[in-house]
Curated annotation (Swiss-Prot):
Positions of Hg(2+) binding: 33, 36
Signal peptide: 1-19
Species this protein is from: Pseudomonas aeruginosa
Superkingdom: Bacteria
Protein known as: Mercuric transport protein periplasmic component
Length: 91
């Protein structure tokens, strides 16, 4: 029983290391009004694997945190393009 508990405790500590979370900043130059970020955020949020989205109109950027085992940057940029706001990775 002690070995089982120790194994579970170790797994709980090590599991976050295996998580494949990434953060990317997308440039979304087509946002032309203060309502545009709402549409962009909704489109990105609907992509499976996205855990956080911050969209800023002033800088025309979207900072996206996602699980790269479930989605990719290409899927994120496709989601914004499909919503009418083409985007690219900000270098």
């Amino acid at each position: 029983m002690k070995k089982l508990f120790a194994s579970l405790a170790l797994a709980a500590v090590v599991a976050p290391v295996w998580a494949a979370t990434q953060t990317v900043t997308l440039s979304v130059p087509g946002m032309t009004c203060s309502a545009c970020p709402i549409t962009v955020k909704k489109a990105i949020s609907e992509v499976e694997g996205v855990s956080k989205v911050d969209v800023t109109f002033e800088t025309r950027q979207a900072v996206v945190t996602f699980d790269d085992a479930k989605t990719s940057v290409q899927k994120l940029t496709k989601a914004t393009a499909d919503a009418g706001y083409p985007s690219s990775v900000k270098q």
